[in-house]
């Protein structure tokens, strides 16, 4: 018994620590002279082999292996249990707090209409499920009242004659739209594949290698012909978490100081934030940067008004190009060197757009799912449109405009909340070409809370519908090629901005659960499962490290369809919430190494130390009492909760009719809506 007692004495403290919630341990046995395959072999053969080898293989050694496996299984179960407990505790906090999305900035009228429709659908589905359960129980021999039996028979005849045909017609129409949109996405993916296989890449007319060989030193006064005058704008509004990082990054752009001017366009209404930004600008000005601070007294037009006001300065006429960076963007020092050369000897080029990269893409599940979406947007949509038709929607930041293109297109307009798409469409109608550089990245942040992401998506999907209403007459009258008009109207606006959110919400959140209660109208399995799975697979290809999240991504995209549908309707019919502009909340995430890397080699050590201090100051500000006064809360989202109950009710009905694929889809989609409705995805504010 000595070996067993020795083993137990050695492993008992570690096992006790693991049982108490400590770090899982692995028990190591010295000189194991057997394998798992030997243990799984026939018992007699195993013992015989043991005798032949003269080894003491016995039941105690097998017990050790089973103990290790049991310990590993217990650790897994303990992790699942702790996760479930934490999830339940978070849900209880949300319900106890009682904070709903009624406090959001959206206008109540359109939101309440959609919520009333979803709630009515939920009540109807619960009633129909009760009727079906009563009929099901009656079929098993239970006694039902004659009135209930008569009602069920009348309902079956009524739904077959009057409800199922229009529902099936609507379902078929949505399926057609779904297939058209899927075909469009497949064509874009094939275009991206063609670009990668043939290594197609936008190149300046003067090759970068030749230009680099010919470029003199940056401090050479004769270098002006190679380094045109560039204006850099940083619009911001109450974004004290990130202003230091963006100003530091822009002030360290590798460009002759005499040929660059930085405009910090501060629309903050908080005096403390204004003072902090002024101090930061003054610090960099004293260090030799050409930088100015601008603050508007009349803050009209949101970001578009801010940019329009800045372009009205008298000194702008001395500059040829303007680079725009939002407050959370941190361009690398060589950004201008890799973008501006594309304008040289290319007078038709109006915009050079870089792609985004994200400093917090692994922060939580919400940021991981956003990263999948945006990787597909840049890698496939922007790159394919830029290569093949020289047009895409300007992303509003991390881009360089030819100032002449902005002026010829009417400049910045305040008529919509998507001023970036507005100027891009007008520039395209005026014949300007765009270039997208997939290999030039600019770091930024993703929204970490569902509330911030939801408001951002509402603005991004309501604005295009506003713009479509305003631009449609101009597109029809414009003297451009017919195929360009067709691309703008049918692909850019209708298919990708209107049809996509419409069928996503209508087909998967309303029609599909209704077909469970009206079985005469059907949706085939390939619509519910196979095609969406294929589209999710294509979407996740540009971010291969995110493959473990393919199922959460599919469910989350359908969950977001309610927000996108509501935004699309608001923009299309000019409802109040379509005109709201809410600045996306920032966290100020950036590594110290990233900030130090922003500094050019010729900067003194003191400036590098200043950059290092930015991170420390940012952390101190985030923990200061002044910031603690402004509290953040997790909310309960009523539309998402109502949809979760609707889908789970439909899942229960599909279980009665033994529709396997429909049941699993409805159940998991309902749980997804439940998690989002309780704000259990993204940042957890305690």
Swiss-Prot record:
Binding sites annotated in the UniProt record for substrate: 326, 328
UniProt keywords, alphabetically: Cell wall biogenesis/degradation, Glycosyltransferase, Golgi apparatus, Membrane, Transferase, Transmembrane, Transmembrane helix
Superkingdom field: Eukaryota
Assigned GO CC terms: Golgi apparatus; Golgi membrane
Gene3D superfamilies: Spore Coat Polysaccharide Biosynthesis Protein SpsA, Chain A
One example of a Gene Ontology biological process annotation: cell wall organization
Subcellular location: Golgi apparatus membrane
MF terms (GO), sorted A to Z: glycosyltransferase activity
Keyword Transmembrane helix set for record: yes
Keyword Repressor tagged: no
Matches recorded under SUPFAM superfamilies: Nucleotide-diphospho-sugar transferases
Membrane topology: Multi-pass membrane protein
Function of the protein: Probable beta-1,4-glucan synthase rather involved in the synthesis of the xyloglucan backbone than cellulose. Seems to work simultaneously with xyloglucan 6-xylosyltransferase. Xyloglucan is a noncellulosic polysaccharides of plant cell wall and consists of a glucan backbone substituted by xylose, galactose and fucose.
Family: Belongs to the glycosyltransferase 2 family. Plant cellulose synthase-like C subfamily.
Record-given protein name: Putative xyloglucan glycosyltransferase 10
Gene coding for it: CSLC10
């Amino acid at each position: 018994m000595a070996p067993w007692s020795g083993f137990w004495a050695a492993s008992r403290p570690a096992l006790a620590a693991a049982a108490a919630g400590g770090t899982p341990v692995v028990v190591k046995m010295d000189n194991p002279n057997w394998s798992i395959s030997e243990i799984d072999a026939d018992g007699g053969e195993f013992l015989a082999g043991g005798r032949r080898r003269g080894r003491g293989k016995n039941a105690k050694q097998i017990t050790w292996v089973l103990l290790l496996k049991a310990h590993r299984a217990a650790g897994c179960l303990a992790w699942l249990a702790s996760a479930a407990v934490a999830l339940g505790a978070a849900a209880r906090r949300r319900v106890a707090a009682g904070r709903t999305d009624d406090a959001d900035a959206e206008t109540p009228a359109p939101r309440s209409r959609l919520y009333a429709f979803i709630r009515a659908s939920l009540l109807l589905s619960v009633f129909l499920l009760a009727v079906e359960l009563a009929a099901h129980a009656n079929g098993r021999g239970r006694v039902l009242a004659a009135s209930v039996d008569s009602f069920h028979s009348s309902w079956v005849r009524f739904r077959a004659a009057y409800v199922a045909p229009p529902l099936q017609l609507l379902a078929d129409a949505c399926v057609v739209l779904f297939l058209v949109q899927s075909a469009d996405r497949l064509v874009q993916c094939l275009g991206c594949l063609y670009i990668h296989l043939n290594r197609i890449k936008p190149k300046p007319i003067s090759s970068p290698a030749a230009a680099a060989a010919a470029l003199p030193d940056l401090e050479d006064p004769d270098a002006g012909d190679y380094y045109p005058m560039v204006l850099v704008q940083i619009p911001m509004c109450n974004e004290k978490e990130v202003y230091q990082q963006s100003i530091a990054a822009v002030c360290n752009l590798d460009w002759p100081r005499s040929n660059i001017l930085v405009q910090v366009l501060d629309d903050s209404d908080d005096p403390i934030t204004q003072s902090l930004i002024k101090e930061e600008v003054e610090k960099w000005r004293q260090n030799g940067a050409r930088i100015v601070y601008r603050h508007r007294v009349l803050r009209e037009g949101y970001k578009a008004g801010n940019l329009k006001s800045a372009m009205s300065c008298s000194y702008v006429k001395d500059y040829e190009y303007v680079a725009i960076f939002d407050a959370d963007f941190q361009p690398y020092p060589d950004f201008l060197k890799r973008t501006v050369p594309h304008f040289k000897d290319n007078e038709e080029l109006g915009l050079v757009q870089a792609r985004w990269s994200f400093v917090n893409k692994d922060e939580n599940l919400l940021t991981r799912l956003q990263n999948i979406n945006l990787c597909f947007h840049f890698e496939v949509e922007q790159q394919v449109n830029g290569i093949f038709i020289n047009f895409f929607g300007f992303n509003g930041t991390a881009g360089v405009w030819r100032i002449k293109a902005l002026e010829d297109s009417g400049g910045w307009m305040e008529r919509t909340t998507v001023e970036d798409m507005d100027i891009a469409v007008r520039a395209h109608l005026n014949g300007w070409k765009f270039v997208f550089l997939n290999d030039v990245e600019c770091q930024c942040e993703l929204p970490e809370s569902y509330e911030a992401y939801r408001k951002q998506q509402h603005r991004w999907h309501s604005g295009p519908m506003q713009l479509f209403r305003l631009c449609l007459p101009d597109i029809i009258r414009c003297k451009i090629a017919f195929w360009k008009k067709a691309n703008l109207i049918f692909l850019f606006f209708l298919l990708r901005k209107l049809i996509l959110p419409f069928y996503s919400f209508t087909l998967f959140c309303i029609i599909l659960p209704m077909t469970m209660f009206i079985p005469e109208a059907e949706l085939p399995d390939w619509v519910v499962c196979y095609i969406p799975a294929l589209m999710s697979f294509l979407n996740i290809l540009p971010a291969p490290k995110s493959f473990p999240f393919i199922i959460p991504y599919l469910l989350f995209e359908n969950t977001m369809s309610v927000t996108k549908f509501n935004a699309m309707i608001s923009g299309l019919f000019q409802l109040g919430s379509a005109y709201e502009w809410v600045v996306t909340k920032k966290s100020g995430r950036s590594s110290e190494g990233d900030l130090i890397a922003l500094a050019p080699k010729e900067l003194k050590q003191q400036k590098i130390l200043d950059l290092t201090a930015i991170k420390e100051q940012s952390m101190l500000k985030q923990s200061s009492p002044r910031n603690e006064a402004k509290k953040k809360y997790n909310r309960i989202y009523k539309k998402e909760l109502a949809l979760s109950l609707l889908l789970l009710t439909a899942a229960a009905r599909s279980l009665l009719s033994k529709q396997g694929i429909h049941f699993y889809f409805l159940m998991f989609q309902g749980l997804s809506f439940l998690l989002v409705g309780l704000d259990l995805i993204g940042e957890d504010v305690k």
